[in-house]
């Protein structure tokens, strides 16, 4: 038993449906699974079906996405309809616990030691979206009270606000923690006076021994007036770094060592990078203390934080109980890992930039919003990507392909099409007739044509012709059919312009650029692509275009040749 023509059409349908659905090359396993699931008579022929499917996939990949869609509409319009009507799984944000008529106050609190990354973007988008839905106030609070270990960058304050506005998440209020040091000092003094805090002079290793043994350190029992005296000396700069720490009294026998008398203030004599602050303060709050005070002072109603910060909530609970405050409603979410970037930290990226490994914070290899924006990723796509992810404690592992799919829905209808030939080689067309061709700027949107003047020589991708042999026939897209007449030097002759002939002879379709094209350099996460492109590309500065058979790119500059940033396939 062999495969019938009907079986082969069925395979092509499912291959095209997979390609259209995901906007990229169809996967052999996925197509095989669907074919075997819906065509039981083919199951005994799996060894024969596999190569046929692979051949179909190879043919599909010779075409561009617009041609996939057009072909599928012809041979299986019902599969197009199925893609459009298939119910999406439940996505998005769950309702907040909000009383009727209550407005919400929510915040995103970054350390401005670098620009926003994909990791921090989730907090910006989700918190701002909840405020949009329920009404209230969205606050950006810069937790910049660590001038030494996670030292803030002055530029990052503005970068965060710029990126928030770009993401349609402009804050209603901006708070800078280092402006509020006197507020933290005031509450520290109150806790010292109440006997709920003390100044500890133990060296780190010594305090750990007491903590691990569930025993109080010698300073825990000091009277409030003694602690206040030490506190004033700390503020006056009379103690050296690491000589004294303010600790919050908790349960010294708590089963979790992290809960036992945690640190609230430490001495840091490194000047703050903000000129308004500089060396004005030498006693700095740790994040658990600063965040606890700010969340109350700002009237926070709901907090969304990583599940890795559950201990912070418990520690802050002691401060809230001592001061008679009610803790905001809190939701936790799991970590998000993007396959393409693995584990990264802002401080690590900063060091790599300083070491010259990356060109800057907008290097296309980085997971920063500045890099994604420069590549042509749209803010609407990022918002939808983050909102669809929802809020849950389960760790999430995702591919950038998911974000790219959302972005493709936005840019596909607005991106004009052009040819870009990377690693170009010259192809001489014998007896060529000079002419002008006018391909559409967009396959489905009526927005005009490109004007390409053709001479006797074309530039093509080396990979398209490096294995060419005498007599090979190729279709030059939008132009004519050719036959290779010489491989060194590379020459061909025109054998007509019939698309039907190209199909019947199963010619590969390749793209090209006239010999007087313009230099183009594409910067991509995987490296640089150097080549030539159509002259009209210079009119697309700051726009996202599609280089046919290559992918979407944002045109970054056109001053000395074209420099483009790769968006995605």
Swiss-Prot record:
What are the GO cellular component annotations? cytosol
Which stretch carries the motif 'HIGH' region? 110-120
Q: What is its main location?
A: cytoplasm
Mind telling me which InterPro entries this protein's record contains? Gln/Glu-tRNA_Ligase, Glu-tRNA-synth_arc/euk, Glu/Gln-tRNA-synth, Glu/Gln-tRNA-synth_Ib_cat-dom, Glu/Gln-tRNA-synth_Ib_codon-bd, Rbsml_bL25/Gln-tRNA_synth_N, Ribosomal_bL25/Gln-tRNA_synth, Rossmann-like_a/b/a_fold
Into which EC class is this enzyme placed?
ligase
Task: List keywords of the entry alphabetically.
Answer: Aminoacyl-tRNA synthetase, ATP-binding, Cytoplasm, Ligase, Nucleotide-binding, Protein biosynthesis
Which Pfam families does the UniProt entry name for this protein? tRNA-synt_1c (PF00749), tRNA-synt_1c_C (PF03950), tRNA-synt_1c_C2 (PF20974)
Q: Name one GO molecular function term.
A: ATP binding
Swiss-Prot/TrEMBL catalytic activity: tRNA(Glu) + L-glutamate + ATP = L-glutamyl-tRNA(Glu) + AMP + diphosphate
Is the keyword Thylakoid in the record?
no
The EC number on file is 6.1.1.17
- Subcellular location(s) per record: Cytoplasm
Kindly indicate whether the keyword ATP-binding belongs to this entry. yes
GO biological process entries: amide biosynthetic process; glutamyl-tRNA aminoacylation
CDD domains for the chain: GluRS_non_core
Which HAMAP family would you find in this protein's record?
Answer: Glu_tRNA_synth_type2
What's its job?
Catalyzes the attachment of glutamate to tRNA(Glu) in a two-step reaction: glutamate is first activated by ATP to form Glu-AMP and then transferred to the acceptor end of tRNA(Glu).
Similarity section? Belongs to the class-I aminoacyl-tRNA synthetase family. Glutamate--tRNA ligase type 2 subfamily.
Q: What is this protein called?
A: Glutamate--tRNA ligase
Output the lineage of the source organism.
Archaea, Methanobacteriati, Methanobacteriota, Stenosarchaea group, Methanomicrobia
């Amino acid at each position: 038993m062999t495969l019938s023509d009907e079986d082969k059409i069925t395979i092509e349908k499912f291959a095209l449906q997979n390609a259209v659905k995901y906007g990229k090359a169809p996967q052999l396993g996925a197509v095989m699974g669907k074919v075997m699931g819906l065509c039981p008579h083919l199951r005994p022929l799996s060894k024969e079906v596999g190569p046929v499917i692979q051949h179909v996939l190879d043919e599909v990949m010779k075409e561009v996405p617009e041609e996939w869609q057009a072909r599928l509409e012809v041979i299986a319009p019902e599969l197009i309809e199925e893609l459009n009507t298939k119910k999406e799984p439940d996505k998005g944000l769950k309702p907040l616990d909000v009383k009727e008529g209550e407005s919400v106050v929510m915040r995103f609190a970054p350390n401005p030691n670098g620009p926003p990354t994909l990791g921090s973007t989730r907090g910006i988008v989700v918190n701002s979206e909840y405020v949009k839905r329920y009404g209230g106030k969205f606050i950006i609070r810069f937790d910049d009270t660590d001038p030494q270990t996670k030292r803030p960058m002055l530029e990052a304050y503005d970068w965060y606000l710029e990126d928030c506005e770009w993401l349609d998440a402009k804050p209603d209020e901006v708070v800078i923690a280092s402006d509020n040091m006197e507020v933290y000092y005031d509450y520290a003094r109150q806790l010292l006076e109440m006997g709920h805090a003390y100044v500890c002079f133990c060296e780190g290793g010594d305090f750990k021994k007491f903590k691990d043994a569930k025993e109080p350190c010698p300073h825990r029992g000091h009277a409030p007036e003694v602690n206040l005296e030490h506190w004033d000396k700390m503020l006056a700069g009379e103690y050296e770094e690491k000589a004294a720490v303010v600790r919050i009294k908790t349960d010294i026998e708590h089963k979790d060592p992290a809960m036992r008398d945690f640190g609230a203030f430490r001495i840091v004599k490194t000047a703050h990078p903000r000129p308004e602050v500089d060396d004005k303060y030498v006693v700095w709050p740790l994040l658990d203390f600063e965040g606890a005070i700010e969340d109350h002072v700002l009237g926070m109603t709901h907090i969304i934080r990583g599940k890795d910060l559950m201990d912070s909530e418990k520690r802050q609970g002691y401060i809230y109980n001592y001061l008679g405050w009610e803790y905001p409603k809190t939701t936790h979410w799991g970590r998000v890992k993007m396959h393409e970037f693995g584990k990264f930290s802002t401080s690590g990226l900063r060091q790599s930039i300083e070491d010259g490994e990356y060109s800057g914070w907008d290097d296309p290899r980085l997971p920063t919003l500045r890099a994604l924006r420069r590549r042509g990723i749209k803010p609407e796509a990022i918002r939808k990507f983050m909102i669809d992810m929802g809020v849950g404690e389960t760790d999430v592992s995702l591919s950038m392909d998911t974000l790219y799919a959302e972005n493709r829905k936005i840019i596909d209808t607005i991106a004009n099409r052009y040819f870009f030939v990377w690693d170009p080689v010259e192809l001489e067309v014998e007896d060529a007739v000079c002419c002008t061709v006018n391909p559409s700027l967009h396959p489905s949107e009526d927005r005009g044509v490109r004007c390409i003047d053709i001479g006797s020589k074309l530039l093509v991708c080396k990979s398209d012709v490096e294995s060419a042999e005498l007599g090979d026939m190729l279709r030059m897209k939008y132009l004519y059919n050719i036959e290779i007449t010489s491989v060194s030097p590379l020459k061909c002759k025109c054998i007509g312009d019939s698309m039907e002939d190209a199909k019947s002879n199963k010619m590969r379709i390749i793209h090209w650029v006239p010999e007087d094209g313009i230099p183009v350099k594409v910067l991509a996460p995987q490296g640089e692509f150097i080549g030539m492109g159509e002259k009209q590309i210079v009119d697309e500065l700051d726009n996202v275009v599609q280089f046919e058979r290559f992918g979407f790119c944002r045109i970054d500059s056109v001053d000395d040749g074209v420099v483009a940033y790769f968006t995605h396939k």
